[in-house]
Amino acid sequence: MAKVPSRSPRKRVRKQVADGMAHIHASFNNTIVTITDRQGNALSWATAGGSGFRGSRKSTPFAAQVAAERAGVAAQDYGLKNLEVFVKGPGPGRESAIRALNAVGYKITNITDVTPIPHNGCRPPKKRRV
């Protein structure tokens, strides 16, 4: 029987990205932070729910801060330095997520609000009566 040449396990080389984009989706119930390269390929992501917050604690600014920190630290392996931030949604974690990305050590070059605004499309949810 012929001996199969063993391949040495190759270490996967992470691509180095200098500039990236951070997409923050802040809904009333959760906050999702995705860090991508310039083409939109995801490098890392984190959510408030995945960071250990459940129920109504997911929708707090602190939960959004923790999620942004986790996504930011995970993306540092790619050598990111500058971030362009896109914020979508009306949630309570909008500002705290941006502050957390700044605290991780990224230079934020631009902040853009990309919240979709309907031109009188779908009917909105009814008003809450508490």
From Swiss-Prot:
Question: Would you say which domain of life the source belongs to?
Answer: Bacteria
Fetch the Pfam families from UniProt. Ribosomal_S11
Q: Which UniProt keywords apply?
A: Ribonucleoprotein, Ribosomal protein, RNA-binding, rRNA-binding
Q: Which InterPro entries match?
A: Ribosomal_uS11, Ribosomal_uS11_bac-type, Ribosomal_uS11_CS, Ribosomal_uS11_sf
Q: Which GO terms describe its cellular component?
A: ribonucleoprotein complex; ribosome
A GO MF term: rRNA binding
A GO biological-process term: translation
Name the family: Belongs to the universal ribosomal protein uS11 family.
Subunit architecture: Part of the 30S ribosomal subunit. Interacts with proteins S7 and S18. Binds to IF-3.
- Function, as annotated: Located on the platform of the 30S subunit, it bridges several disparate RNA helices of the 16S rRNA. Forms part of the Shine-Dalgarno cleft in the 70S ribosome.
What's this protein's name?
A: Small ribosomal subunit protein uS11
Q: Which organism is it from?
A: Shewanella amazonensis (strain ATCC BAA-1098 / SB2B)
